[in-house]
Amino acid sequence: MEQNEVKKLLHHRDPYLMVDRVIEISPEYIHSQKDMSSHVITGGHFPGAPIVPGAMLQEMCTQAAGVMISKFHAPVEDYDSEKTKGYALGVLSEIKNAKFVGMTRPDQVIDIKVKLENKQRSRFDFTAVVFQDGESRAAISFQLVNIPSDLL
């Protein structure tokens, strides 16, 4: 799935859209990728020795999970980010645990692998691992919720 299809499932837009492509997706799993080489944030974090901020790695995981929710777990049929039908999908409600290992550099593709661990009504618990060059860079567990858009 390329980014134009991702945009139908997520409200995020550049420069904050953190899913460039989806490699694999199912109702319980998503593998997405992000290329940060020319991203605006990398020039200032840190000049001369750029690294991708941990908060951005978390956001990549959250957005990948949001794609999965929009595609397979939306409370309305044919969800489209332009026609939300009254819902905000995949709103971050909790970061349960986050561990960052090593430095994630913006000059290589970042792989994000997210697994749906539990679903109860409109609450979704996920675990995610962020990889770069085949090595784990972060392990994150978090919760997203679907809410009526009038609560935003």
Predicted regions and their residues:
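Short Pro/Gly-enriched beta-strand edge/turn motifs at strand-loop
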Residues: 1-6, 110-111
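Beta-strand-rich interaction surfaces with strong enrichment in secreted/lumenal proteins
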Residues: 7, 48-49, 99-102
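Catalytic strand-loop segment that frames the active site of acyl-thioester-processing enzymes
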Residues: 11-52, 56-57
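Terminal leader/tail segments of proteins
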Residues: 13, 33-39, 94-95, 105-113
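HotDog/MaoC-like acyl-thioester-processing domains
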Residues: 27-28, 70, 101-152
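Active-site- and interface-proximal helix/loop "cap" or "latch" segments in soluble metabolic
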Residues: 52, 57-71
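Hydrophobic beta-strand-centered segment that forms part of the acyl-chain substrate-binding groove
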Residues: 66-111
